[in-house]
Amino acid sequence: MPKEEVLEFPGVVTELLPNAMFRVKLENDHEIIAHTAGRMRKNRIRVLTGDKVLVEMTPYDLTKGRITYRFK
């Protein structure tokens, strides 16, 4: 089965929410709610307010996403 199309956008974490969720402001001024990807949790990569991140989203729900990378 082919992997479904995902959209990737850079953004900035604006708020930490409960249950390892984050409010992220994308470069196109949209605000979404995102959680960290499994590999980031496994490697214990911390995400804090103000961090620049790469968010992966599905075209079906543009209000939720997955943080896949934290820029240095």
Swiss-Prot record:
Gene3D superfamilies: Nucleic acid-binding proteins. PROSITE patterns: S1_IF1_TYPE. Its main location: cytoplasm. Residues 1-72 form the S1-like domain. GO terms for cellular component: cytosol. Component of the 30S ribosomal translation pre-initiation complex which assembles on the 30S ribosome in the order IF-2 and IF-3, IF-1 and N-formylmethionyl-tRNA(fMet); mRNA recruitment can occur at any time during PIC assembly. NCBIfam families: infA (TIGR00008). One of the essential components for the initiation of protein synthesis. Stabilizes the binding of IF-2 and IF-3 on the 30S subunit to which N-formylmethionyl-tRNA(fMet) subsequently binds. Helps modulate mRNA selection, yielding the 30S pre-initiation complex (PIC). Upon addition of the 50S ribosomal subunit IF-1, IF-2 and IF-3 are released leaving the mature 70S translation initiation complex. Belongs to the IF-1 family. This is Translation initiation factor IF-1. The gene is infA.
